[in-house]
Design a protein with these regions (language model features):
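The feature marks the mature, well-folded catalytic cores of soluble enzymes
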Residues: 1-212
Length: 212
């Protein structure tokens, strides 16, 4: 006798009605917490600085370009093909490379650069996270291989948290092969819990938030 037959026998003996299927209640919808732009900037800054990252706010694209120039201090940098970097004229800086004849030259430049410069598709305020969607404009190598990473991001791309990101990108697979979330500099620890930065990626990260 299977389980349902046994239970039916018990119900009949007790004079009870047949069991009715009970539908599961719908999952509760938790709305995204909304805060002001200034609150998001403050939250993002605090979260990233807690992870040894750095946040610089710029009032214009021109100021952002000059800030990048100052951070580079004549050292070599490689920039992604993000259209926002071009709009900020960062790819026009004399010590920033952004165009290469082939993939081999591109990889070599990434390995030799002191800085990798990207934008970001989004930034998450509550964790100080950059969201990088791989594609024609953004390459993972620029944000991964150089020892220092500079991300230039317009404030309008600053979201509250991961929940809001999922609402913006409900099906990431439709757009790209990967989506990378970068939270602070690369860090790792051995069995003795000795923390080391920069082993598996950039040991320094600076995010320049630009007012739209």
């Amino acid at each position: 006798m299977n389980r349902e037959a046994m239970l039916e026998t018990v119900r009949v003996a007790l004079g009870r009605k047949p069991a009715q299927a009970i539908e599961s209640p719908p999952a509760p919808y938790l709305p995204v917490v909304t805060s002001s732009v200034e609150q998001r900037i403050a939250l993002f800054t605090a979260a990233l600085e807690e992870l040894a990252g750095r946040v610089i706010r710029c009032s214009s694209r021109e100021t952002a370009c000059e800030t990048v120039r100052s951070l580079l201090d004549s050292k070599r940098a490689i920039a992604s093909c993000a259209s926002y970097l071009k709009e900020c004229r960062i790819t026009d800086l004399e010590n920033v490379d952004s165009e290469f004849p082939d993939a081999a030259a591109y990889r070599q430049a990434c390995s030799e650069a002191n800085f990798g410069i990207t934008s970001a598709d989004y930034a998450l305020a509550d964790t100080g996270t950059l969201v990088m969607i791989s594609g024609a404009e953004e390459s993972r190598l620029v944000s991964l291989l150089p020892p220092a990473h500079i991300a230039v991001v317009p404030v309008s791309r600053l979201l509250e948290d991961l929940d809001e990101l999922m609402l913006r990108i409900p099906t990431p697979s439709d757009r790209t092969s990967s989506m990378v979330l970068i939270t602070g500099p690369s860090r790792t620890a051995d069995i003795e819990q000795i923390l080391v930065r920069g082993v598996h990626g950039p040991g320094e990260i600076t995010v320049i938030l630009v007012d739209d």
